[in-house]
């Protein structure tokens, strides 16, 4: 069901004024997707957690760490035949269907993961993850600025066209929201995710459950928009659907059917039409669409053929033979004219310099912090209350030798208060990883530029919080009231806070789950608290433990203040 030249020229004329607006300087290069004998493997096995498993995971933590370090444990994999073979030309849309949605997700992730150049293929998951404090227009503008150099007029036109294309003009100034903050609906969020994926400029787009949360009319409009963009820019799109009408079904050029980890069909969708009266398939309901008959084909009766039999039958079919011929021809052409491995298909595109990306990310991070004014105000109030509490508890300490021990306890309490307030970064980093993973995969941001901008914004915001805390503590407790001493006290606390923030973020990035991140951060904090020099002085520590003093920010800050 290939698209003819007349429809392509019509789509191109429809989008001719988008060439410099919709994807300026990021026109995707037509890419052929070909794979033979591909075997998708599961990422991991996630058992159902129980109370007993939580206790055992805590006790057996050293053994599990040793297993990961020395690779003693082998993953349990279901034996599967590497029967996945497909040849997709530029400008084609592929429908991925399976009785189990997880099989479609695994197949799409395998396509995106095995590419030579990052950003050439992107995966849009079924879960729509966006910054909840931004509006729809703000998100699109930041995504446009992150990809390439644009003039202000072109940026405005691109935003208007995107909003009009996906029919989300009415929510341009509405917060995206999340489970707590009220925002846009699920269908509007899904259309925003599709628009964001198009802005990535990737050559191959993989959509998991493309029409999730959309009604029939909106789903048809969304698929037709993607069809027009594919015809205009010769993209390659893989999409899985939970339900599809006959019009949506006819929009796709190829079909991949999966059952129990085997490819049971690969070819044009029109080949499924004669299967309505197949006695070996589960009968579809009356007036069912072709997509329903497809599911009836891959969900057979208990007495019908197995997945192995269906895969073997597909390998003996004419569609598999045509795919094998196309793959052999394509591989022969690739071997005849190999491209240099260092030549990226995006070397000609005009990109932002690193400092411009940092500036753009600085603006966005400042806007994110300012939008979340409630959390910002609460954190300032907590620092004020904490500083006043410590200051009033140690009000007007004696400046003689009698107050030396109390003064040491005061400084140690200040160090602990600053360190405890930075523990919240573990939860923020762990829960925010899906969004970061998405923007890094789309190449909207680079990790180095993102963390540089994040540290700069944190320094500006956290300096005000630490300043409020330092004023309350320093002047209520009658410490040495000179400008150099106060500035030194403030600088040590600020450096301590930033060190703990970065340490907790590193723990959140290294741990796989939220539970393991919290336990690791708590263990590290308690260890640093005990060996900081107040509870257990450095002189009384065993020789094998003294070297941790140089890795302990609490110990370094406490010794600097003393």
Describe each PLM feature range.
Residues 264-266, 274, 278-286, 296, ...:
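Membrane-spanning alpha-helical segments of multipass transporters and channels
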Residues 197-204:
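A short, proline-enriched helix->beta-strand linker immediately N-terminal to the Walker B motif
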Residues 194-195, 222:
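Hydrophobic anchor residue at the start of the ABC signature
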Residues 1-92, 97-99, 117, 124-126, ...:
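Topological signature of polytopic alpha-helical transporters
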Residues 102-103, 128-138, 150:
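Conserved catalytic motifs of ABC-family nucleotide-binding domains
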Residues 201, 217, 221, 225-244:
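Conserved catalytic loops of ABC-family nucleotide-binding domains
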Residues 209, 216-217:
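Helix N-cap at the start of a conserved alpha-helix in ABC-type nucleotide-binding domains
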Residues 180, 207-211:
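Walker B catalytic motif
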């Amino acid at each position: 069901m290939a698209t003819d030249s007349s429809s392509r020229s019509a789509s191109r004329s429809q989008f001719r004024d988008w060439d410099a607006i919709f994807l300026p300087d990021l026109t995707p290069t037509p890419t052929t997707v070909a794979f033979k004998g591909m075997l998708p493997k599961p990422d991991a096995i996630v058992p159902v957690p129980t109370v007993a498993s939580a206790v055992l995971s805590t006790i057996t933590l050293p053994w599990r760490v040793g297993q990961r370090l020395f690779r003693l444990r082998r993953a349990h994999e279901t034996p599967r035949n590497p029967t996945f073979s497909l040849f997709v030309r530029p400008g084609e849309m592929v429908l991925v269907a399976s009785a189990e949605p997880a099989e479609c997700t695994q197949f799409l992730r395998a396509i995106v993961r095995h590419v030579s150049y990052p950003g050439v293929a992107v995966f849009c998951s079924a879960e729509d993850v966006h910054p909840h404090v931004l509006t729809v227009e703000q998100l699109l503008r930041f995504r446009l600025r992150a990809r390439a150099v644009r003039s202000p007029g072109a940026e405005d036109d691109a935003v208007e066209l995107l909003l009009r294309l996906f029919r989300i003009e009415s929510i341009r100034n509405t917060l995206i929201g999340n489970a707590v903050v009220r925002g846009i609906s699920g269908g509007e969020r899904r259309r925003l995710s599709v628009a964001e994926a198009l802005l990535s400029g990737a050559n191959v787009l993989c959509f998991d459950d493309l029409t999730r949360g959309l009604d029939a009319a909106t789903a048809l409009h969304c698929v037709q928009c993607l069809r027009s963009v594919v015809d205009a820019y010769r993209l390659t799109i893989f999409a899985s659907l939970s339900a599809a009408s006959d019009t949506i079904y006819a929009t796709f050029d190829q079909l991949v059917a999966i059952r129990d980890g085997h490819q049971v069909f690969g070819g044009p969708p029109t080949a499924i039409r004669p299967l309505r009266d197949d006695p070996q398939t589960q009968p579809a309901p009356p007036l069912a669409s072709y997509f329903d008959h497809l599911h009836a084909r891959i969900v057979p009766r208990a007495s019908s053929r197995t997945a192995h039999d269906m895969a073997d039958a597909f390998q003996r079919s004419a569609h598999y033979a045509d795919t094998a011929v196309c793959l052999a021809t394509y591989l022969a052409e690739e071997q005849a004219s190999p491209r240099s491995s260092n030549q990226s298909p995006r070397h000609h595109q005009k990109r932002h310099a690193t400092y411009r990306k940092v500036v753009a990310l600085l603006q966005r991070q400042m806007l994110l912090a300012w939008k979340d004014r409630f959390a910002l105000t609460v954190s300032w109030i907590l620092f004020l209350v904490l500083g006043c509490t410590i200051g009033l508890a140690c009000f007007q300490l004696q400046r003689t030798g009698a107050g030396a021990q109390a003064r040491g306890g005061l400084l140690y309490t200040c160090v602990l208060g600053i360190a405890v307030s930075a523990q919240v970064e573990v939860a923020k980093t762990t829960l925010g990883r899906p969004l970061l993973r998405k923007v890094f995969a789309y190449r909207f941001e680079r990790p180095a530029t993102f963390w540089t901008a994040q540290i700069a914004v944190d320094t500006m915001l956290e300096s005000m919080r630490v300043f409020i805390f330092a004023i309350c503590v320093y002047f209520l407790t009658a410490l040495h009231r000179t400008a150099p001493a106060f500035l030194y006290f403030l600088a040590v606390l600020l450096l301590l806070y930033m060190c703990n923030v970065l340490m907790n973020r590193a723990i959140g990035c290294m741990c796989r789950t939220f539970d393991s991140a919290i336990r690791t951060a708590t263990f590290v904090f308690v260890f640093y608290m005990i060996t900081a020099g107040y509870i257990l002085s450095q002189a009384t520590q065993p020789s094998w433990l003294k070297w941790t003093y140089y890795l302990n920010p609490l110990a370094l800050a406490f010794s600097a203040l003393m």
